[in-house]
Amino acid sequence: MDDKVSEKESSPKQTEEDSEGKMAHVQPASYVNKKKYVFGKTLGAGTFGVVRQAKNTETGEDVAVKILIKKALKGNKVQLEALYDELDILQRLHHPNIVAFKDWFESKDKFYIITQLAKGGELFDRILKKGKFTEEDAVRILVEILSAVKYMHSQNIVHRDLKPENLLYIDKSDESPLVVADFGIAKRLKSDEELLYKPAGSLGYVAPEVLTQDGHGKPCDIWSIGVITYTLLCGYSAFRAERVQDFLDECTTGEYPVKFHRPYWDSVSNKAKQFILKALNLDPSKRPTAAELLEDPWIICTELKTHNLLPGLKEGLDARQKFRNSVERVRLNMKIQKLRDLYLEQTESDSDFDEGSQANGSVPPLKATDTSQLSKKLSEEEQSKLKSELTSKAFAQLVNTVLAEKEKFLNINRVCSSDSDLPGSDIKSLDEAKEKPEGKDTKTEE
């Protein structure tokens, strides 16, 4: 695609500079586009806004809408730059395995980014519903991920946050393409060799060089693919550290950054393990590119193992998903309430946040109207106390669920970490491989 973007595509950055002056007067010209969309349920929430499902009434297409509050972004140059980068990157990428950009517009107080809606669910959720999962199935998935990353890297774009939660199916059919989503911290490099130095990513999937701030580029995405592949084949994550230094210690202790615990890895081929170790090379300059991994012996092998890995996968993946879902239900409602408290007037009725803001199975977040009717009778201190009590009760109803799921999840971790490694001969076919010394066990994610 031509490096030059259209006037409309480049205008968010320009219009934002004038937005403060407009906020007290009229809506920006692009706001008329909002009339095309009917908003539905809330899909997620963050520090600066929410993501909601919507329908384009002109085309009938379901879409995802990221809504960002300008007040929250005001004065935050880093986040504003990330917003402009995301818009620029989304408009440059056109690939069947990358979520498609649809539109953008703004109101006097919000930005709206419209993208393709992936209705088929997350990668690991789909696997849990299968009756069988083999290495052949894993390879098909990785070909889609690698194809997307190869294309991104050819455009000098680094995703920097590849993880299972950002790998989504477009629809529920068996033929649905898998797409890479969430380019919120992606960066467009000025050259093939440019390095970035500010840390970004998700602990457990982020490459070591990102955290040590030694400079990172395209190879950091390859590391993330290695971690995803590891979990794809065993059901638990390669690392369980919850702090940066613990993670760095975990992946640098021993000759290899990960171990293949038995019995979980007994039925996985050596070629698959070699693929993982190549992607998880601690030296980013020695990691293969996405194009090279597409030609890896494991990926192009015509006689892959057909052993059903699903029974072993389900225990780990199911505990992982239930724990994460419980935590996310709490986080979603707390984030939405915080956004209301910080940036919306108490009496303001804001359809962008009220309708459909409840996470499935969770306690409804407080609405501004819950206390507005009492405002004349209660002092500010009393109102604040009431809101705090209501929030605490809502949170308390969820905390037991989270703790229960966490205990199940940690039980899986303990089993994995207590198992011995596979015999050293199991990985000796690697170039320059030696018998792996005993070191710190690698365990599951937080």
Curated annotation (Swiss-Prot):
It is an enzyme of class 2 (transferase). PROSITE patterns: PROTEIN_KINASE_ATP (PS00107), PROTEIN_KINASE_DOM (PS50011), PROTEIN_KINASE_ST (PS00108). GO terms for molecular function: ATP binding; calcium/calmodulin-dependent protein kinase activity; calmodulin binding; protein kinase activity; protein serine kinase activity. The keyword Phosphoprotein applies. The modification Phosphoserine is found at residues 357, 417-418, 420, 429. ATP binds at residues 43-51, 66. This is Calcium/calmodulin-dependent protein kinase I. It comes from Saccharomyces cerevisiae (strain ATCC 204508 / S288c). The gene is CMK1.
